Amino acid sequence: QSGFNWSVVQKKWPGFEEAFHGFDLGPNIFMSDDEFDEHLKNTAIVRHAKKILSFRDNAIFLSDLAKEHGSAAAFFANWPVDDLVGPWEVMKKRGSRLGGATGQYSLRFLGKESFILWRDVTAVLISAGVIEKPATSKTALKAVQGALNDWKAESGENMTRISRIVAMSVG
């Protein structure tokens, strides 16, 4: 759903599933130029060239992770929760259009215990002196991870719950 209005994606979801073979990696890895051109004409999906190409690129990325780690799911599931910035960096570097909030939401949708830097979470982190502005640099992201690790240790709660509580504590 990267960069799209979520309600638009939800309405077009059946079209995406059909066009991209139920999200089976194999056919998407080998998307031909002709198939790509057909996707650009397909009114059942959002016709954005770079995002359509990202299906192929991310199918390759996930397939590579599977070869390296047994499965892409194992790669993400086994990544330590005290370093959630790590898989975000991997997704940004090796995936296509998976940086920023997209990577954060991806982990959450995969069921990975994680945090999301919503506007309200960022406001709390700034107010607490953890960061000075929205965290985009590696240094700032590591500071955020450190603060959330501390809150996890102090509270005994998981990262997802902490992230949600922090988000609801302002606004």
Where are these regions (language model features)?
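Hydrophobic (often cysteine-bearing) scaffold residues that line and stabilize catalytic clefts
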Residues: 5, 12, 51, 117, ...
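C-terminal accessory module of base-excision DNA glycosylases/AP lyases that mediates lesion recognition
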Residues: 76-171
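Short, solvent-exposed positions on alpha-helices
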Residues: 7-8, 50-53, 160
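A short structural micro-motif
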Residues: 15-19, 38, 46, 112-113, ...
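Alpha-helical ds-nucleic-acid-binding substructure associated with the helix-hairpin-helix region
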Residues: 21-97
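A positively charged, amphipathic N-terminal helix/segment that binds anionic biomolecules
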Residues: 1-23
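Short, amphipathic alpha-helical segments that act as regulatory/interfacial helices
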Residues: 13-17, 56-63, 145, 149, ...
